[in-house]
From Swiss-Prot:
This is Uncharacterized lipoprotein MG045 homolog. It comes from the Bacteria. The keyword Signal applies. It is a lipid-anchor. Keywords: Cell membrane, Lipoprotein, Membrane, Palmitate, Signal. It comes from Mycoplasma pneumoniae (strain ATCC 29342 / M129 / Subtype 1). Residues 1-22 form the signal peptide.
């Protein structure tokens, strides 16, 4: 596997810009968050359907883009999907158009026709979360918030049932490690509110829910101040590093300039692999199993993103389904072994070229794929050692029987799981030392988004809020940052 870069990219022949522009509804527009799609895959998709590519920083900008008919296809978090569906802006997903096959008697046979059929493509967690949203969107990636820290282990953060309130207290108790701008957080009002609400409920010992129950400025302010009440404020930590660009935070955690960060698990994994600038990091600061730690709290906000289609652009119905298939579903009904096939001649210095689009996208984005053949704990490529099927090195002069014999031998060998192979490639090593193996274990553990049976997933997913709630949430966030962070 080649080094994966998340630098912003430009592709020949593909028009891209940031934010909303005056796009005609006759233009096919794909909109997404930055660095949230493989450049190689986007190039492949554009070859089939010419398009304009736009980016946006928040779901709120996305909602506006659908309402004013700017976007054809976009990536949206679950609450934005619900809100857009309620407003009548979404075209239903026609699952039959993807021509994916259901598994029957151990083989792929009947075509998937609807959301109920489609559930077999995804992990159990996706089925628990998505519900009726599968009528309106195709799952893209799954994430939850985690805490990353560098250096020696903090004993309070060891164990299975660590809470966010425990993490906040540990940060304050070890402020010599995190003060002076060395604790990083995402500058996103809704995400930080959801986290604050988790802390709020944990402290009050009430049922955890990330969603607001009130709508006043005072209500939102009180929830945000749950952080300050536990000591997470300027008075204790001097200053905090709050930034809206997750890539900056990833790279700062990877090189050790920031000693702690509250990020999504996919970003934590990418930081563990060295981020964008791995080759520039001093060897002593490179992440390893002893100096890079990821804490997955018992209750934590979960985000499931979907690909959706604009109801106002039915003339792009077929092209929209084709794009979604390439980005999220191509290879979804294949075996794990098939999914790993690459074409070395078509790859670049930054990306391997995978035959199937869903694998291409996962290998670049590195967030939790909803697909069973990638993320299932027993059969998915992230956790499973797969049979090695590559026989390209067989010498042409060999007899057919010799080739078949050698092929059979190759098929009996085992190939590393995805992240072991990735780290070996980054280290340019045939094997991993103990620290590297510990880091792989940390990454694979972080990749799993597991909740206890008594925890309701629905309470950890952000739901639509009213315009008044959105306005007061944003104003309260700005006020809280100014006063405390």
């Amino acid at each position: 596997m080649k080094k994966q870069l998340k630098y912003w990219f430009s592709l020949m022949g593909l028009t891209m810009s940031v934010g909303l522009t005056a796009c005609s509804s006759n233009q096919f527009v794909f909109a997404n968050f930055e660095s949230y799609v493989s450049p190689l895959l986007l190039e492949r998709a554009e070859a089939k359907q010419p398009m304009t590519f736009l980016t946006y920083p928040t779901n709120e900008k996305l909602i506006n883009g659908f309402a004013n008919n700017t976007y054809t296809v976009a990536v949206a978090s679950s609450y934005a999907v619900s809100e857009l569906q309620q407003q009548g802006h979404l075209l239903p997903i026609d699952w039959a158009k993807f021509n994916l096959k259901k598994t029957q008697n151990g083989s792929n046979q009947a075509t998937i026709q609807n959301k109920e059929d489609a559930k077999e493509l995804f992990t159990k967690e996706i089925g628990d979360i998505s519900g009726e949203l599968l009528n309106w969107g195709v799952p893209y990636f799954l994430q939850d918030l985690v805490f990353v820290y560098r250096g020696e282990k903090i004993q309070e953060l060891e164990g299975q049932d660590v809470t966010w309130s425990t993490i906040i207290k540990a940060i304050v108790n070890h402020k010599d490690r995190f003060n002076n701008n060395r604790l990083a957080l995402i500058d996103d009002a809704r995400t930080i509110f959801s986290l604050a609400n988790v802390v709020h409920h944990e402290v009050k010992n009430t049922t955890v829910d990330v969603n607001p129950t009130g709508s006043t400025l005072n209500y939102f302010g009180n929830v945000y101040e749950s952080f300050a009440n536990l000591g997470l404020k300027r008075d204790n930590l001097n200053t905090l590093f709050v930034n809206s660009d997750s890539n900056i935070i990833i790279n700062e955690l990877a090189n050790g300039r920031r000693q702690g960060g509250i990020v999504y698990n996919g970003d934590a994994v990418y930081a563990a692999l060295g981020g964008d600038l791995r080759d520039e990091i001093n060897e002593n600061n490179l992440p390893n199993g002893d100096n890079f730690h990821i804490v997955q709290p018992k209750h934590s906000p979960v985000a499931l993103d979907f690909l959706i289609i604009n109801q106002q652009q039915t003339h792009f119905r077929d092209a929209a389904h084709q794009l979604i298939y390439q980005l999220a579903l191509e290879g979804a009904d294949q075996t794990a072994e098939e999914l790993l096939k690459t074409d070395e001649e078509k790859g670049t210095s930054d990306e391997d070229y995978y035959t199937y689009g869903a694998m291409q996208n996962f290998s670049y984005v590195n967030y939790v794929s909803p697909l069973k053949n990638i993320s299932d704990e027993t059969t998915g490529i992230v956790f499973k050692e797969n049979k090695q099927a590559d026989t390209k090195q067989v010498v042409k002069q060999q007899s057919q029987s010799e080739q078949q014999s050698e092929s059979a031998e190759k098929e009996e060998t085992e190939q590393d799981d995805f992240y072991t192979a990735t780290l070996k490639s980054l280290l340019k090593a045939d094997s991993l030392d103990d620290k590297a193996k510990k880091l792989v274990d940390t990454i694979k553990k972080t990749y799993k988004i597991k909740k206890a049976d008594n925890i309701n997933w629905a309470n950890l997913i952000e739901k639509p809020i009213t315009p008044l709630q959105r306005s007061n949430l944003t104003l309260s966030w700005l006020d809280f940052k100014q006063r405390f962070w």
